[in-house]
Amino acid sequence: MTLRLFDTESRTMREFAPLVPGRASVYLCGATVQGEPHIGHVRSGVAFDVLRRWLQAHDYDVWFIRNVTDIDDKILNKAAEAGRPWWEWAATYERAFDRAYRLLGVQPPSAEPRATGHITQMVELMRRLIERGHAYASAGNVYFDVQSYPEYGALSGHKLDDVHQGESAGEGKRDPRDFTLWKAAKPGEPSWPSPWGPGRPGWHLECSAMAEFYLGAEFDIHCGGMDLVFPHHENEIAQSKAAGDGFARYWLHNGWVTMGGEKMSKSLGNVLSVPNMLTKVRAVELRFYLGSAHYRSMLEYSDKALDDAVAGYQRIEAFLHRTAERVGEIPVGKWTDAFAEAMDDDLAVPRALAEVFRLVTEGNKALEAGAVDTARELGGQVRAMLGILGVCPFDPQWDHKQDDSVAQTALDVLVRAELDRRQQARADKDWATADAVRDRLHAAGIDVTDTPNGPEWSLRTARGKAN
């Protein structure tokens, strides 16, 4: 069966046919690094890591780009409120996201570009748009002329008359529906030079420029959360295609993590941070939970749903460990046809997991009957399927010191809370409190080092330091 994916733009299931045979190019909208990652943030990372693994299983050479938005109004505002440099704030939470992805077993991207590292490409894209009559400069700002692009709204289904960009009218806008490509410099804010005056890029411009730079004018798959369909992805399409690029050929969007039927969001105060979740369950169990629903479905969080997922994973894990105790090493086998059919059907993970549990049931029966060869074969198949989902307990990511990993994560949460108090005290010039926090951590065996990217901590041992 050929891999089929649901394409948001055409609203149909389409067979995946890459632009270049044997190669798959994928762009995932990454984090705006404004704060601690919560499980709603990282669901897309887990979901599209499964896509990447399945493409690799189809023998594609996958070039996977996940960007970092490290300049944004929210970053500037939160850094200013905390009295910290914007770049330090962004770097701190970029590391927090990297740590969360790493703990959840998400494969590192082929490249992870920062927006601030690609201003040159953004300026060039704006120049092309202005030359083609699709953008205009006004009072140091640059705007995209939405009416100049008749196909606007094709991705989201929005009619032009109904468009609201969710941004201010803007100085010099010809039409309130036009969106910002370049924001003129303001006192106290970072800026970069451009032919239209100093300023900084708009969010939509960043992704178009980075996707083209790393993947080319046309590439295979663009991924992201469903909340990005409009305006972000709609605007990406408009500016890239208006500039003459083919841009993405398939659009994939994952559903939200919800609580009480509402999207998990810091503005609603209903977030569950990744570090705090990892004090309750192991990282592999959290990944299993986040990846257990179909990627396009909403994932309604509840303690019971999490507990059920953990119990399900532990059932699989127990079968594999019992089998290994009886037969020794379990070689990785080949997934079943039913598993492959499910994954080829728009990554139907719930059906794929049903096949995993079917084999676990058969395997447990084989163990009870003393049919160890059958159990070994079934265990190998289960290992292969869990490997695609990124949760095989025997994989190096998970097969060492899981309890130590949970304890380390819990300690990191507590220490970073203290470091945040210290940073706030320093911003307030409350040196006594800042020193007291540092001394308290030192007495507990924790050394703090101030770096250009913010404070780092290490645990002191009898022989020295160990991160």
UniProtKB/Swiss-Prot annotation:
A motif ('HIGH' region) lies at residues 31-41. GO terms for cellular component: cytosol. It is found in: Cytoplasm. Its cofactor is Zn(2+). One of its GO terms (biological process) is cysteinyl-tRNA aminoacylation. HAMAP family: Cys_tRNA_synth. PANTHER family: CYSTEINE--TRNA LIGASE (PTHR10890:SF30), CYSTEINYL-TRNA SYNTHETASE (PTHR10890). Monomer. This is Cysteine--tRNA ligase. It comes from Nocardia farcinica (strain IFM 10152). The lineage of its organism: Bacteria, Bacillati, Actinomycetota, Actinomycetes, Mycobacteriales.
